[in-house]
Regions:
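Well-ordered alpha-helical scaffold segments within catalytic/enzyme domains
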Residues: 41, 45-46, 80, 112-117
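Acidic/histidine-rich alpha-helical segments that form the ligand environment
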Residues: 97-130, 136-148
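Short, contiguous alpha-helical
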Residues: 32-36, 40-43, 51-91, 130-173
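Residues within well-ordered alpha-helical secondary structure of globular protein domains
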Residues: 13, 48, 71-74, 108, ...
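Extreme N-terminal tail/first-helix region
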Residues: 23-33
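Short, solvent-exposed, charged loop/turn and helix-capping segments
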Residues: 49-52, 92-93, 118-120
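Bacterial Sec-dependent N-terminal signal peptides
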Residues: 1-25
């Protein structure tokens, strides 16, 4: 009986120790929540925008509707590659900005961003990286990723409204 008690105690300690190491940092959970929010809104808006409007641009030299969606998707890959120290060609798909391509790229890029970020530990978040000629902690750079996504969500809302498309979540209110 005494041996069973010891085995149970050691097992319990190992279980709780393992669980505490496996817990996701609060910052990562909050980041993933923001990614889900922006993904949901951008995907709804991209779905609501008619295919014919994907080539619309508010002016010469400004990204079209479809190009904004593809840019947001590619930026997810690019900014994550900066964190990981990998190379990514930022302009590999921007010429293909039709609705089907844009939706597919966004879906995949958001899933990739979430899967990668979900693995980050507190130690990873504290690492220093260099991007855009500046030094960032990974945590701070993840804030930059979210800010960038929100920037293009706002841009996409403006584009939609300029084309007579009401964001689906606004239409429901």
């Amino acid at each position: 009986m005494h041996i069973l008690k010891k085995i149970f105690s050691v097992g319990a300690v190992l279980l709780f120790t393992t669980m505490s190491f496996a817990e996701q940092p609060v910052f990562v959970k909050e980041f993933l929540g923001q990614v889900d929010f922006v993904k949901g809104r951008l995907m709804q808006l991209a779905e609501a925008m008619p295919e014919d409007n994907y080539s619309w641009t508010p002016g010469e030299g400004v990204r079209s509707v479809g190009e904004v969606y593809v840019h947001a998707a590619e930026a997810n890959y690019y900014m994550l590659s900066l964190i990981k120290g990998e190379k990514f060609d930022m302009n590999s798909a921007e010429s293909k900005s039709d609705k089907k391509t844009a939706l597919s790229l966004m879906e995949k890029s958001f899933d990739n961003l979430k899967e990668s970020a979900a693995q980050f530990t507190d130690e990873d978040l504290d690492k220093e990286i260099e991007a855009f000629g500046m030094k960032f902690s990974v945590r701070n750079f993840m804030v930059t990723i979210i800010a960038h996504l929100h920037e293009h969500l706002g841009q996409s809302i403006a584009y939609a409204r300029m084309n007579g498309v009401t964001p689906p979540w606004s239409a429901q209110e």
